[in-house]
Amino acid sequence: MSSQGRSRIYVCHTFYHAYITCLKELHIQRDPVQKQAGAVLLLSSMSNDFGNLKERAEKSGLFTEVLPFDEKEETYFPELAQYRTDTGNLVKNMLQRICFTRKFGKLLEPYIPVDFKRFDDIYVFCDSDPIGYYLSTHKIYYHAVEDGLNCILYYDTARYDNRGHFKLKAWMSKHNLIFIQNGYNKYCLDMEVNDASVLPYPCEKYLEKPRKELTDDLTDEEKDTVVGMFIENKDKLETTLREGMNHEHKVLVLTEPLCDLETRKRIFRDIIAQYGSIDGEPAQILMKPHPRDVLDYEKEFSQYIILDKKFPMEILNYVKDLKFDRVISVLTVTDAILFAKEKLFLGEDFMDRYEAPEIQDRKSVV
């Protein structure tokens, strides 16, 4: 390690990615030398609207620059379509894929906002997105980072996207002929995962970095930085939680994109009516909409505190003095919640009151 430290850049596609980036930098910057080296945050607009996160990230003091990234999907370039046809022949398909990989990486050049080669460490969340093709085509080494907590356990995109002759394709990616994400590309130095032991298929580049290590020893000041970066009007929220009506008891309701909108309103009204009191006393109700929930909770549940649906639920772990008497979810897994005395998971049986089980695949909402 040089006396100047190592300069860093992070490519993020979601708020969760930015959250993990924030945690990583809080730890790295405990070393003054690394803090001086600086970090740049790149926010890709390809699949997510970050709103004014850029401004709040700039104010956090963690980044020397926060830049928007107009990352382009392959469909933006119609000339690539010819390389995506199935010829019915493995050799021809692989030759087409080689051409696709090279051409896609080149076409992205005008949309890359920084010179990646000037950074010592490049961290990419979800390198299956176009940025992975760009870096591999231009022979730039990078670190891949797990898209979500243990996400490869639930959906191994590298193997699924390349099912059929996977070993051959992995060999080709290792030699940078084609591109495969999540640790299989030549220019991917390592693939950070939370827990390698739970992953059914080993990969030599998996690097176990438990997310718990990023959260267990945060100072109060560091927690305040996290909250300030992801929650707008932080001070106003904290005052409301401390002094607002029925603040002595708190209940958090996690919404989900269930059923049609009218049924959804009824579901959450019923939940609040049944579980919104603690020991017979009305509680202060907070609602955290699911990122894909389009119901207007500000309008339909205006008497309650409606949290921004964009920020990761884990951020609530760091709000000063925030403890919930009860957290209620229908189908959402609540393992990441550390701030509740009671977690109430209502499950499939509860949903059967509102909808026949065969109508939808409910697992798709969690």
Q: Each predicted region: which residue ranges?
A:
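Conserved nucleotide-sugar phosphate-binding/catalytic loop shared by glycosyltransferases and other
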Residues: 38-86, 305, 309
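A donor-sugar binding/catalytic signature common to diverse glycosyltransferases
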Residues: 21, 315-359
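Conserved nucleotide-sugar donor-binding subdomain of glycosyltransferases
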Residues: 81-129
